[in-house]
């Protein structure tokens, strides 16, 4: 007798199944169940056709799924707990694509060195791996690969119910420049101005300090060149020259970048 458990649709909420079946582009499903307060969530990217084909099997695992997002016609994102049977279902085609909550260094991914994988734009795509070994590796690196509840809000605003903390975060977005139309990954750009002396320090020798800031925060940090040629007075007094820095990313990475910059400048009394 087979050990596999077949999905039992008669035990499922048919309205819920229909809602997921008819999920439109740009829409999302939010699970109203209560999840553990300190839970970590994987954000998995799937082909919509695969999700639709295996819909009943996914519905069997709804108690492990916090949200389902359909950003476009071809793609579904699933925010779920780190649960072996659900991940095994997703890994049916021997491909697992994980959307990461923040920048991850190659050092953090060393556990996958014996695995065929690609890492680009905060997406980890794993292919042709033994599932049991893969699951162990993911559990080992859960703190790097998974979202906290707070990070889920930063990248998927409507997955969580509204509360005072969320409202404060939403107010803060009015103070930054949005990066084009509203996006599901909630990327924003913050513009700050520093003087030339501070900028020179932040860049560091051969750009090493600014690269370290980018790597640690996960934010994109761009220094806008000064458009006008500096006068002799300005060259002798660089602290009088203002220069712009653009910091792009989610609120978490931007806050981390700004805090790191402020800390570095305060330490040297700049």
UniProtKB/Swiss-Prot annotation:
Q: Which SUPFAM superfamilies match?
A: Eukaryotic type KH-domain (KH-domain type I)
Name a Pfam family for this protein. Answer: KH_1
User: Could you give a GO molecular-function term held by this entry?
Assistant: U1 snRNP binding
Q: Where is the KH domain?
A: 191-225
Question: What organism does the UniProt record list as the source?
Answer: Saccharomyces cerevisiae (strain ATCC 204508 / S288c) (Baker's yeast)
Give a short account of what the protein does: Required for chromosome pairing and genetic recombination. MER1 may function to bring the axial elements of the synaptonemal complex corresponding to homologous chromosomes together by initiating recombination. MER1 might be responsible for regulating the MER2 gene and/or gene product.
Do you know which SMART domains this protein is assigned to? KH (SM00322)
- Top-level taxon of the source organism: Eukaryota
Q: What induces it?
A: Its expression is meiotically induced and required the IME1 protein.
Q: Name one GO cellular component term.
A: nucleus
Give a GO biological-process term: positive regulation of mRNA splicing, via spliceosome
- Output the InterPro entries linked to this UniProt entry: KH_dom, KH_dom_type_1, KH_dom_type_1_sf
Q: What name is this protein filed under?
A: Meiotic recombination 1 protein
Q: Which keywords accompany this UniProt record?
A: Meiosis, RNA-binding
């Amino acid at each position: 007798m087979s050990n596999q458990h077949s999905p039992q649709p008669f035990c499922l909420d048919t309205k819920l199944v229909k809602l997921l079946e008819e999920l439109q582009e740009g829409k999302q499903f939010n699970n109203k169940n209560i999840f553990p307060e300190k839970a970590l969530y994987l954000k998995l990217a799937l082909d919509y056709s695969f999700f639709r084909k295996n819909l009943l099997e996914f519905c069997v695992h709804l108690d492990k799924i916090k949200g389902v997002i359909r950003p476009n016609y071809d793609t579904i994102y699933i925010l779920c707990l780190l649960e072996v049977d659900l991940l095994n279902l997703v890994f049916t085609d021997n491909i697992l694509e994980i959307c990461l909550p923040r920048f991850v260094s190659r050092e953090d991914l060393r556990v996958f060195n014996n695995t065929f994988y690609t890492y680009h734009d905060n997406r980890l795509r794993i292919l042709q791996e033994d599932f049991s070994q893969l699951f162990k590796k993911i559990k080992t690196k859960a703190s790097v690969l998974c979202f906290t509840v707070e990070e889920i809000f930063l990248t998927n605003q409507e997955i969580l119910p509204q509360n005072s903390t969320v409202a404060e975060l939403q107010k803060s977005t009015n103070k930054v420049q949005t990066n084009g139309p509203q996006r599901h990954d909630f990327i924003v750009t913050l513009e700050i101005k520093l003087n030339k002396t501070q900028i020179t320090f932040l860049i560091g020798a051969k750009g090493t300090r600014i690269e370290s800031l980018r790597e640690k925060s996960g934010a994109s940090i761009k220094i806008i060149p000064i458009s006008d040629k500096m006068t002799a007075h300005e060259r002798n007094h660089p602290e009088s020259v203002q220069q712009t820095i653009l910091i792009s990313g989610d609120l978490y990475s931007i806050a981390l970048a700004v805090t790191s910059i402020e800390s570095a400048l305060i330490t040297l009394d700049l």
